[in-house]
């Protein structure tokens, strides 16, 4: 049995506690400084998590932020970061107050992200490592989880397959073995870049696949589109995988990772009706991004759109329309706030 501390009481952090519990680990969730009222409400409602619509088992210990120092000062084998990408600076600050290079436990990130730093692409795992090194912690072992695993499904223990990635294959294997259950099926990989890049950019491509219904034909009725758009969706998925392979290799990942759980698997789930696919469907119908955001998804975070805005300048410097026709069309539709138009002749 190992002691695991999950930082963040959101949907995925809380759901992730289930396979940890079922492996007989000492599992603890500690909220961020922004989640105190949420945790009070959660406990008042008998551990019914509103983001999961299911109860968190009582055996999973849930603490408010005030307990973070006490929890992390104990014998912790694995710290799981279930915070938003915007909370990475905060997390690095908290960890640097408690640990040094000699005693920091292994870290596992549930959060995905890609940004631009000094005109270079920077994955969220790399950003965390950079921030910790800036604070004097140089020996850091960070793993990440990739693959098609929605939080509500995991919380209800439905069969789910994921990949644990770490640059050191032995560490990836060990953590995968720690978490594997009869419903949470874990594999392992040393292609941390490939897994993380796939996980981030699939949000852009799931918008493109989500647009299939509107894009399938200009000459048929909405009723016909509704029944016959899957041909188009399949073509867009195939092109998405082709372009994801190019981009993953550009960021020093392995192209074969794209056809695994972190790429194709996650794209399939995300294209099935998540926030990115919803935004794509509105854009496919002919709305611009700003129109869709204002009228349909005003208060909803669309990760693919946020990423498109973040990397637009850099990706247009690095690639042309002939190389990444679908990705650039989607990104430029978002950032230039224009209707989505695809050049099918450029597809492979």
Segments predicted by a language model, with ranges:
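NAD(P)-dependent Rossmann-like dehydrogenase/reductase catalytic/cofactor-binding core
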Residues: 202, 209-213, 217, 227, ...
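General beta-strand structural signal in soluble alpha/beta enzymes
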Residues: 109, 140-146, 186-190, 259, ...
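Glycine-rich, N-terminal phosphate-binding loop of Rossmann-like dinucleotide-binding domains
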Residues: 9, 82-84, 272
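Short beta-strand/turn micro-motifs composed of small residues
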Residues: 8, 31, 109-111, 146, ...
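Internal alpha-helical scaffold of NAD(P)-dependent oxidoreductase catalytic cores
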Residues: 98, 131-141, 159-256
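NAD(P)+-binding Rossmann beta1-loop-alpha1 motif at the extreme N-terminus of oxidoreductases
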Residues: 1-56, 60-66, 70, 117
């Amino acid at each position: 049995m190992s002691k695991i501390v999950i930082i963040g009481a959101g949907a995925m952090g809380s759901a992730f506690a289930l396979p940890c519990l079922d492996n007989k680990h000492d599992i603890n969730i500690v909220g961020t400084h922004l989640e105190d009222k949420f945790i009070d409400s959660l406990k008042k409602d008998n551990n019914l998590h509103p983001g999961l619509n299911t109860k968190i088992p009582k055996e999973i210990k849930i603490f408010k932020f005030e307990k973070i120092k006490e929890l992390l000062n104990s014998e912790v084998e694995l710290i799981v970061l279930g915070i938003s990408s915007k909370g990475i600076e905060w997390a690095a600050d908290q960890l640097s107050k408690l640990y040094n290079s000699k005693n920091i436990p292994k870290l596992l990130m549930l959060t995905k992200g890609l940004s631009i730093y000094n005109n270079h692409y920077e994955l969220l795992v790399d950003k965390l490592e950079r921030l910790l090194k800036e604070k004097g912690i140089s020996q850091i072992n960070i793993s990440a989880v990739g693959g098609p695993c929605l939080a509500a499904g995991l919380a209800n223990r439905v069969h789910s397959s994921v990949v644990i990635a770490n640059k050191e294959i032995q560490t990836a294997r060990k953590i995968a073995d720690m978490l594997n259950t009869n419903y949470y099926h874990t594999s392992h990989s040393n292609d941390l870049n490939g897994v993380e890049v796939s996980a981030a950019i699939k949000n852009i491509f799931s918008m493109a696949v989500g647009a299939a219904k509107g894009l399938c034909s200009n000459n048929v009725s909405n009723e016909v589109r509704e029944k016959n758009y899957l041909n188009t969706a399949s073509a867009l998925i195939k092109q998405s995988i082709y372009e994801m392979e190019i981009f993953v290799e550009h960021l020093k990942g392995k192209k074969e990772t794209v056809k695994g759980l972190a790429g194709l698997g996650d794209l399939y789930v995300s294209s099935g009706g998540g926030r990115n696919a919803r935004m794509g469907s509105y854009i496919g119908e002919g709305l611009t991004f700003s129109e869709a955001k204002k009228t349909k998804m005003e208060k909803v975070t669309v990760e693919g759109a946020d990423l498109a805005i973040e990397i637009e300048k850099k990706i247009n410097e690095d690639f042309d329309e002939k190389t990444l026709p679908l990705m650039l069309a989607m990104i430029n539709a978002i950032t230039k706030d224009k209707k989505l138009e695809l050049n099918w002749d450029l597809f492979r």
